[in-house]
């Protein structure tokens, strides 16, 4: 049986992550409060951010920026701004 969580991002009960994907306290918070669907949305945004801003994951400043964007997206309901990207109309 799948583990369910109340997803902070999507504001609904949904399947939780299978295991903690991010280290530390933030990783525990993500595991306890973010569903698979929201995590997949973040991974798409993360890839776009890394590519468009040409982030280097070996650079601590770039990792810090990406982590802040992740917190903003998953927990504060903020959209990731990617210059030149227009989301498809719904």
Curated annotation (Swiss-Prot):
Organism ancestry: Bacteria, Pseudomonadati, Pseudomonadota, Gammaproteobacteria, Vibrionales
Single GO MF descriptor: iron ion binding
Keyword field: Iron
Keyword Zinc-finger belongs to the record: no
GO aspect biological process, one term: cellular response to oxidative stress
Family according to the record: Belongs to the Fe(2+)-trafficking protein family.
Pfam families in the cross-refs: Iron_traffic (PF04362)
GO terms for cellular component: cytosol
Transmembrane residue ranges: none
Name of the protein in question: Probable Fe(2+)-trafficking protein
Function per UniProt: Could be a mediator in iron transactions between iron acquisition and iron-requiring processes, such as synthesis and/or repair of Fe-S clusters in biosynthetic enzymes.
Signal peptide: none
Domain of life: Bacteria
């Amino acid at each position: 049986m799948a583990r369910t969580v109340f997803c902070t991002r999507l504001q609904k009960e949904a399947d939780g992550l299978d295991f903690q994907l991010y280290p530390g306290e933030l990783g525990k918070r993500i595991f306890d409060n973010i569903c698979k669907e929201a995590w997949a949305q973040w991974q798409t945004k993360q890839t776009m951010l890394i590519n468009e801003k040409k982030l280097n994951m070996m650079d601590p400043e770039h990792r810090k920026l990406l982590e802040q964007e992740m917190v903003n997206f998953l927990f504060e309901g903020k959209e990731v701004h990617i210059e030149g990207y227009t989301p498809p109309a719904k």
